[in-house]
Amino acid sequence: MIKTRLARGGFSHRFIIKNMRYPVTLEPVEEGGYFVSFPDIPEALTQGDTREEALEMALDALITAFEFYFEDNEKIPLPGPVGQDYVDVPLSVASKVLMLNAFLDSKLTQIELANRMGVKKQEVTRIFDLRHSTKIDTVGKVASAIGHQLTLSIE
């Protein structure tokens, strides 16, 4: 099991994600196939001809919905309890979700974050782009700059 945690030093403000899994609802469609929705992320909707295809499409729909939260500077709801069906979010995306939520809690602007990190604002813009590959060390630097600590463990 891989665990990702973004903790705020001195506070009990912790985000612990063990395999960030978002529950999905698969509904059979009269014409055939399945309609997919996420109870925690209502914007993420998709469908597939088969159950397997629907679940494959679900991850892309979820990440696309996350992108809207990033663009709008809104916190991303964390996953609720998982039932029968779920989608595992890649750790690279999960770490950015936690990073965005903690950044928004900090009330800093991206310019202030860039200044604290000693980088240009364009670099911070790239960091907050889900489709841009960001090194985990960079996520750790963001965490530090906003008064948090990124902790990874393998159990």
Curated annotation (Swiss-Prot):
Keywords annotated in UniProt: DNA-binding, Repressor, Stress response, Toxin-antitoxin system, Transcription, Transcription regulation
Keyword Metal-binding: no
Keyword Repressor: yes
Regions recorded as binding DNA: 110-129
Pfam families: HicB_lk_antitox
Any one GO MF annotation of this record: DNA binding
SUPFAM superfamilies with a match to the protein in the record: lambda repressor-like DNA-binding domains, TTHA1013/TTHA0281-like
Superkingdom assignment: Bacteria
Annotated HTH cro/C1-type domain residues: 99-153
UniProt signal peptide: none
Similarity comment: family membership: Belongs to the HicB antitoxin family.
Function: Antitoxin component of a type II toxin-antitoxin (TA) system. Functions as an mRNA interferase antitoxin preventing effects of the HicA 1 toxin.
Name this polypeptide is given: Antitoxin HicB 1
